[in-house]
Structure formats: C-alpha cells, structure tokens
C-alpha cells in the first residue's frame, strides 16, 4: 500500500549532505555557474568579505550571461551589505530586495526575519 503524498516525487533529483561551510559555498558557486534560466537566491546574511564577494560575483556572472537572478536578503542580517554592493548587483541586472526592512512599526516585526537559505 502506498501512502498518498501532496507532492509527486520527480525522478532524477538528488540530495547531497554538505558537512562544512567550504563545501556549501563550493556547491552554491557551482549551482549558480550551471544555472540555465533563473536563480532565486534568498538568505539571511551576506557579508562584504571573501566568501560574500565570491557568491556575489557568481550571481553577477550569471546575470551577465542572461540568467534571470532574483536576490532576497534579510534587512537585519544583511545590514553590512553596502550600498556599493547593492548598486553593483542591480547594475548587473539582478533583481534585489531587502526582506522586512528594519523600520519597526510594531513589536512583532523585529522577530520576522528571513532565516531560510534558498538557491
């Protein structure tokens, strides 16, 4: 007897467990470089450091080769993401947005953060 599922399983997909930050960022960069149509990149934090620039440069390369890139960054976690970097990604054609800007209008908004990572 098969248990019904809300989601159909698609063959050809795979899951890989990444055990370190370095293997994660290598896999991210490879996935970005191999994208064929679009990239949805959502994250809590990107710093203007070697790792952050590595991922940003991969996204910019993708946009420059015609891939549609959507980039959503948490406003609180991304507070070190400079205006210069924002301009750089937008000039490359990346659709960039901040999630939940830090302007607090009620007591609940501070805890509404974008903690998931999607690529």
Where are these regions (language model features)?
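N-terminal localization/anchoring segments of enzymes in phospholipid and broader phosphate metabolism
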Residues: 1-119
């Amino acid at each position: 007897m098969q248990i019904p599922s809300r989601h159909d399983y698609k063959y050809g997909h795979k899951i890989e467990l990444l055990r370190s930050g370095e293997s994660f960022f290598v896999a991210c960069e490879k996935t970005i470089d191999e994208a064929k149509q679009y990239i949805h990149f959502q994250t809590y934090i990107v710093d203007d450091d070697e790792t952050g620039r590595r991922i940003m440069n991969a996204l910019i390369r993708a946009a420059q080769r015609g891939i549609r890139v959507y980039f959503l960054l948490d406003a609180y976690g991304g507070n070190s993401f400079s205006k210069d970097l924002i301009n750089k990604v937008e000039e490359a054609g990346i659709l960039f947005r901040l999630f939940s800007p830090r302007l607090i209008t009620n007591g609940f908004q501070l805890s509404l953060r974008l903690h998931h990572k999607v690529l």
